[in-house]
Amino acid sequence: MQGYLAEKASQGVAYDLRNALFEKIERLGFGYYDRQETGQLVTRLTSDVEQIRTFAGSGVVQLASAAIMLLGTTVLLLFLDLQLALVALATVPAIFVLLLRFVQRIGPLFRGVQQALGRLNTVLQEDLSGVKTIRAYAREDYETDRYREVNDDLLGRNLETVRTFANNFPFVFFVANLGTLGIVLFGGLRVIGGTLTVGELIAFNTYLGFLLFPILTIGFLSAAFSRAGASAARVFEILDAPIEVEDKPDAVALPPVRCRVEFDGVRFRYPGDEREVLKGVSFCVEPGQTAAILGTTGSGKSTLVNLLPRFYDVTGGAVRLDGHDVRDVTLSSLRSQVGIVLQETLLFSGTVRDNIAYGRPDATLDEVEAAARAARADEFVQGLPEGYGTVVGERGIGLSGGQRQRIAIARALLVDPRLLILDDSTSAVDAETEAAIQESLDRLMREEHRTVFVIAQRVSTVRDADLILVLDEGEIAARGTHEELVRTSELYNEILGSQLEPAPAGG
């Protein structure tokens, strides 16, 4: 019964820790994920929590039992013979000093083991996610060597902890046996002197074993405690991590917006980076307008739109929707009015319908199909074996890149956003499909008077936008319509010219 209750309690601790960790991870800002490896987070949620659970269960019970046994045996030995008891107990402080030094040495080693395990999980996660790329470039041997390298590091760290055990515990046993030797010598002299009988000496020596057993048990448990402590420190690094983007104490709900978007002197740098990605960006997009963002790689296009749903907070200036600073409203009320299709399309394991309805789980099948038609996804979905009930694999395996993008667009449209953000979301579809999607989006957005932000690499995608912003090194280098920029912007014409196909050679 004692074991059952201890295990039940430890499982409860692990359950609560996993829930607390997951809830915290869900609330942490994107800046935190930019600095962390996925494998390390997975290891903290699994292996580190399990180390804590193991000690919280059997370890705590054994520690309590050993402490009670140590206290009881000490009292008994003092009662039997005060002089012999003092001789026996003389080694106890030395043993605990050795154990304390052991804990101080082994703790950082266990932390290193967990860090190495996290790196191993990171390599594994990257390998599984990029298996097609690895095969395409015939890099299997390289990845195998990379995995073996981190696995060797993990093995080395584990062996180092084993060596620390082997180098420290013989001294603990030696000091413990010194106590036994002292009892035999001092007790033998008293037997010779007639102040102690042989039977009393044997009995005392027997009880001495009950003193050494809990001390050695505590010694072995100190290793489990050190490992649990190292894991707990890693777990609490997440639990104590500051949330970079969260609701202000006096945040208010954002009312339904017409979605006039204003950037007012916006400056931004990523946490830990001194380089400014956006430098004093200012512009205004009226309700129902389509704004297109163009620029070279690294010019700050994705960063700019990431500030709209407040994935990051500006480091200077302000972003406003209908005059409301996005930092002054609740995140839920803000993001519920924003639909976003990211450049990296993610689908979850489940049916096509579940993926489209991810933002609105209560949506009817008719609503799901309407969103799919608007995204030009309905035709290929109907051709799947089970239609909208077809189960797609993890990350949308089984669908082409263009099909995944169209499902992601349908998912964004279904939430009925006042502001739609398309981050290069049609890069994987052909020109004909892109034109059809754009036509549907234009009709939907203008009928409902919605505001759209489009990031695209192709000028053909954005030439009909009401406002085109050309970014260069975090600043707006040019702005206007397509016709205006063709007349006035050298950079825009360079981008346009780079996308024109050279005329075929005559012959």
Describe these PLM feature segments:
Residues 247, 254-507:
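ABC-type nucleotide-binding domain
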Residues 92-100, 165-179, 198-223:
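Hydrophobic alpha-helical segments in the permease module
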Residues 30-31, 47-56, 60, 64, ...:
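An intracellular "coupling" helix at the cytosolic face of ABC transporter transmembrane type-1 domains
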Residues 11, 31, 39, 43, ...:
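Short active-site loops of ABC-family nucleotide-binding domains
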Residues 58-112, 185-196:
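Transmembrane helices of ABC transporter permease
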Residues 1-15, 23, 27, 34, ...:
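Transmembrane-helix motif of ABC transporter permease domains
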Residues 21, 25, 134, 235, ...:
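Helix-loop junctions and hydrophobic alpha-helical segments within the transmembrane domains
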